[in-house]
Amino acid sequence: MKSLKLIGLALGASFALSASAFAQDITIAVAGPMTGSESAFGRQMKNGAEQAVADINAAGGVLGKKLALEADDDACDPKQARSIAEKIGSSKIPFVAGHFCSSSSIPASEAYADSNVLQITPASTNPLFTERKLWNVARVCGRDDQQGLVAADYIVKNFKGKNIAILNDKTTYGKGLADETKKALNKAGVTEKMFESYNKGDKDFNAIVSRLKRENIDLVYVGGYHQEAGLILRQMRDQGLKTILMAGDAMNDKEFASITGPAAEGTLFTFGPEPRNKPTAKAIVDKFKAKNIDPEGYTLYTYAAIQVWSQAVKKANTTDAKKVMDTIKAGEWDTVLGKLGFDAKGDIKQIDYVVYKWDAKGGYAELGSKGS
């Protein structure tokens, strides 16, 4: 486990002075995969959190105090996530923006609830995160049942009569997304020709690719993360398959193209409407660009999660997690993603997934729009 105070802390001329200054800070946390196979997404979250805290502090802070940011590494490991949640709770930190993986967010949320910590995830899409109706959870992203429906709708309209395969990596996120997509496809009258799983971290997919080839699969839907999806795609091309690969929001990192090279061209994935293109995000995107940082993927979602919390704290005039959560669910909040409102479970009311396509140059664009 790694923890680091990142923002809002400055060394004073003496220990006494600095200790006095630190006492005035409100520490919040961002938790996600800062190391490990999903660390690209951890970097996105950390970048978004750092900028949000810096901007809030520049505008005067919260309740007359500055914010300090603690970054915690769960490596997308459920046990490590639970341990981090217990540590954050014992530290009396009132709010965490996290986690990334649903398999981390779900067990961590229970520990946060026990410790009176409010949790807003920028990225965990498994429906179970909010369906358990814990009082302390919310998300600024959509859900797998929603993006599975969008993916299925695209497949039905564009691959009618074609052979479809569905793969998943057995994780809470990947299996959940594959199941939701399968459910939506089957409801629309499409039966997949192949439904198979693999283990997260696998490198050799030749057996799966060989079966895809035998079954004459036209489109393979992958419920999983970009590393394995990239290897599956590369190995398909090595065997001469022109099968289209489609996946979910975990494909939204340019590391995918570094794995596949030009083979990325034509790959599809679902995600929210490009946050970097929203008018509400322009000023913040410009700040990132000035630092030579691309605020891709979940960078702006993490920024928005902290915006929602800070605005609700100001309105409630307290950092008490239960009072702040009641305030969040009762209002609408101006964020880089636009106005966000939440239902009683903590899901956003404004749901809008779209389909993206990768190009040969390592970029991607929303279908029907110009490239990113």
Identify the residue ranges that each predicted region occupies.
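N-terminal signal peptide c-region/cleavage motif recognized by signal peptidases
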Residues: 16-20
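Extracytosolic ligand-binding ectodomains
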Residues: 2-11, 22-372
